[in-house]
A protein has these predicted regions:
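Beta-propeller domains
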Residues: 1-155
């Protein structure tokens, strides 16, 4: 039924006389363990895509306290890593207005820092390189939310 080129993942329609017809899925691991809250460029929803963005859990793995980008074709990853006191929200991909490439845009993630004298902030990353472009620090605490969305201003 479906095979992804260069991947071990597949979806096959199976006929079974006892159970009827069903779809058998075979998954494939991409990247390192610990990747969570995956997001893609929404312009690629329902279409082939190459990059997925996510966060690392709070375990001791590779993605811990990170915002990550994984190339699903190669399995290679890039990350921005905070410190052990910072907790990051789900990343939100914001496409550049004149984007040509899939990863042409920025990643937004709120970062809550549990230390008393360290500010919470909105993190802005270059989606292609995962390098920090800037941050907007706030006075006070930013509620640690798991999910986020970017809504552009309507003109």
């Amino acid at each position: 039924m479906v095979r992804v080129p260069g991947s071990l993942a597949s979806a096959m329609k199976v006929k079974n006389n006892q159970d009827g017809t069903y779809i058998s899925l075979v998954g494939a691991d991409i990247g390192e363990p610990g990747f969570d809250m995956p997001q893609i460029n929404e312009r690629h929803t329902g279409k082939p895509y190459r990059y997925v963005y996510g966060t690392g859990g709070y375990d001791r793995g590779y993605f811990r306290n990170s915002v990550c980008k994984v190339d699903v074709e190669t399995g290679r990853s890039l990350k921005w890593q905070g410190n052990e006191y910072q907790y990051l929200s789900e990343p939100t991909f914001v496409s550049a207005p004149d984007a040509v490439d899939e990863d042409d845009g920025v990643i937004l993630s709120s970062v809550a820092d549990v230390r008393k004298d360290s500010p919470d902030f909105l993190l802005v990353l270059n989606a292609r390189t995962m390098e920090e472009l800037g941050r907007a620090e706030i006075d006070g605490q930013l509620p640690n939310s798991l999910h986020g969305v970017f809504l552009p201003e309507k003109h």
